[in-house]
Amino acid sequence: MLRRLLERPCTLALLVGSQLAVMMYLSLGGFRSLSALFGRDPGPTFDYSHPHDVYSNLSHLPAAPGAAGAPPAQALPYCPERSPFLVGPVSVSFSPVPSLAEIVERNPRVESGGRYRPAGCEPRSRTAIIVPHRAREHHLRLLLYHLHPFLQRQQLAYGIYVIHQAGNGTFNRAKLLNVGVREALRDEEWDCLFLHDVDLLPENDHNLYVCDPRGPRHVAVAMNKFGYSLPYPQYFGGVSALTPDQYLKMNGFPNEYWGWGGEDDDIATRVRLAGMKISRPPTSVGHYKMVKHRGDKGNEENPHRFDLLVRTQNSWTQDGMNSLTYRLLARELGPLYTNITADIGTDPRGPRSPSGPRYPPGSSQAFRQEMLQRRPPARPGPLPTANHTAPRGSH
């Protein structure tokens, strides 16, 4: 019976027509539609096997007003939404580590304090890059060497702030970021705050360092450490971007996470509790390379992180920008960045040995162990109202 059915002209015509329709659908981008339906849209395709030099196209940038050959100053149009100087994938090298003098020489347009403003057009975003730091001088120089030309090609107005934790106490990344946000906003009304780990180098300048007015952005979505994929859906670590209003709406970042681990998940929970959603660039765009390093003394695994995480729902309105205390020790305008040195105190709980095997913080073994120990998030209750930051005059 099936054979007789297939021999009918109308049946054959229907089958041939169906095949043609499927072929046309796929040729017109059906694979991308299916990808968006069943998984994360990978975005545009880039060839990372043939990257450009990270300093490509800088010589093509317009000269600043007053410079030799520059047109006279006048009212400027807005810079294009996507800069014509972008090149896509860029080479990232960890050796040799450049000196600060070499980085200054290669970035003559960068002004005191690590500030830059494009010539020839009005920037569409003023972005502050905030980098928590301690005892990572080689990493900092690599970041500055790669990040300055990367940002200049995007035609942004930007400033780089390095927030240095004074003393030898346990490292507190999230609290340093709170300090950096407060100090950066004393300088200027920035449109966008980029919170940037010192050991992550961007590999594609189409990954724009601008904020999304609809909600916080997690930008480091494809790190070589995790095989260029997102390790888990709630991950918010590495590099993230928020407007000042978004940052204050979630009461900033927590101050109580001393040592490695936990604060990224707390921050992702804050975003949800504040009624916002996380957005991300396509996986093909948000590529980062991590500078290899051993576990840092003073940044051991935080044995209290899981206890803190289960309290986030109730603690986020009390622990953050509205409870931030620190002592500003120095504010220095260097040729490549603004250095903020702050005394943020010490862990009031003191050290405690965690149970189970110890692995270097940030290692793949430590990551797997943490995922196995991860507790399910508490069910959200009624959305509380975030308190805003303390008055500007107080620390």
From Swiss-Prot:
Binding site for UDP-alpha-D-galactose: 132-136, 171-173, 198-199, 228, 260, 293-295
Subcellular location as annotated: Golgi apparatus, Golgi stack membrane
Keywords: Disulfide bond, Glycoprotein, Glycosyltransferase, Golgi apparatus, Lipid metabolism, Manganese, Membrane, Metal-binding, Signal-anchor, Transferase, Transmembrane, Transmembrane helix
InterPro entries for the chain: Galactosyl_T, Galactosyl_T_C, Galactosyl_T_N, Nucleotide-diphossugar_trans
Cofactor: Mn(2+)
Sites where a glycan is attached: N57, N168, N339, N387
Pathway the protein acts in: Protein modification; protein glycosylation
Membrane-topology descriptor: Single-pass type II membrane protein
GO cellular component: cytosol; Golgi cisterna membrane
Membrane side Cytoplasmic: residue ranges: 1-10
Ranges per topology, Lumenal: 32-395
Membrane spanning residue stretches: 11-31
Cell division recorded as keyword: no
Disulfide cross-links: C79-C121, C192-C211
EC assignment: 2.4.1.-, 2.4.1.38, 2.4.1.90, 2.4.1.275
Binding site for Mn(2+): D199, H293
Residues holding N-acetyl-D-glucosamine: G262, E263, D264, D265, R305
Catalysed transformations (reactions): an N-acetyl-beta-D-glucosaminyl derivative + UDP-alpha-D-galactose = a beta-D-galactosyl-(1->4)-N-acetyl-beta-D-glucosaminyl derivative + UDP + H(+); N-acetyl-D-glucosamine + UDP-alpha-D-galactose = beta-D-galactosyl-(1->4)-N-acetyl-D-glucosamine + UDP + H(+); a beta-D-GlcNAc-(1->3)-beta-D-Gal-(1->4)-beta-D-Glc-(1<->1)-Cer(d18:1(4E)) + UDP-alpha-D-galactose = a neolactoside nLc4Cer(d18:1(4E)) + UDP + H(+); a beta-D-glucosylceramide + UDP-alpha-D-galactose = a beta-D-galactosyl-(1->4)-beta-D-glucosyl-(1<->1)-ceramide + UDP + H(+)
Stretches for region Disordered: 340-395
Record function comment: Responsible for the synthesis of complex-type N-linked oligosaccharides in many glycoproteins as well as the carbohydrate moieties of glycolipids.
Family designation: Belongs to the glycosyltransferase 7 family.
Protein's name in the database: Beta-1,4-galactosyltransferase 3
Taxonomic lineage from the root: Eukaryota, Metazoa, Chordata, Craniata, Vertebrata
Gene giving rise to this polypeptide: B4galt3
